[in-house]
Curated annotation (Swiss-Prot):
It comes from the Bacteria. This is Protein PsiE homolog. Belongs to the PsiE family. It is found in: Cell inner membrane. The keyword Ribosomal protein does not apply. Its main location: membrane. The keyword Cell inner membrane applies. It comes from Haemophilus influenzae (strain 86-028NP).
Length: 139
């Protein structure tokens, strides 16, 4: 009898341990992202203050990287706010931002740029479906 009760508790114990490991890893990741965000902010401010050697693409790339880091920190915050759940729309936001960064950084090939823009369009359509799925069900 006692043994069966312990076996019933085992999945809950494993789940709790894994949740603690996940939360610890996410907190560590948030700290690393905050440090990276501070570095990007410093780099951006130095680029803006030292305008003699600034390449506009470098500034744009750093700005988009800032928003990527900021978005991932926001994703971690939302994970804890929403009861240990990652909302899908935040991953789509991160994907759109990453593709924008790729277009800014890698713009030599026009075919690649069009493909990247198509990927952004697909993600925007997916985002609209996610955001308006409840309204679409009522139609």
């Amino acid at each position: 009898m006692e043994e069966s009760l312990e076996l019933e508790k085992l999945p809950r114990i494993i789940t709790d341990v894994l949740k603690i490991v996940l939360c610890t890893a996410l907190i560590a990741l948030a700290i690393v992202l905050i440090i990276a965000l501070v570095k990007i902010t410093y780099t951006l401010s130095m680029m803006v203050l030292n305008t003699s050697s600034v390449v506009p693409y470098d500034v744009a790339e750093q700005a988009v990287m800032f928003f990527l880091y900021f978005g991932f920190i926001g994703l971690i915050v939302q994970y804890f706010k929403s009861g240990y759940h990652f909302p899908l729309r935040y991953f789509i936001y991160a994907g759109i931002t990453a593709m924008l960064r790729l277009i800014i950084v890698n713009h030599e090939s026009s075919v690649d740029t069009i493909l990247f823009a198509g990927a952004i369009l697909i993600m925007v359509i997916a985002l609209c479906l996610v955001l308006y799925s409840n309204k679409l069900k009522n139609i």
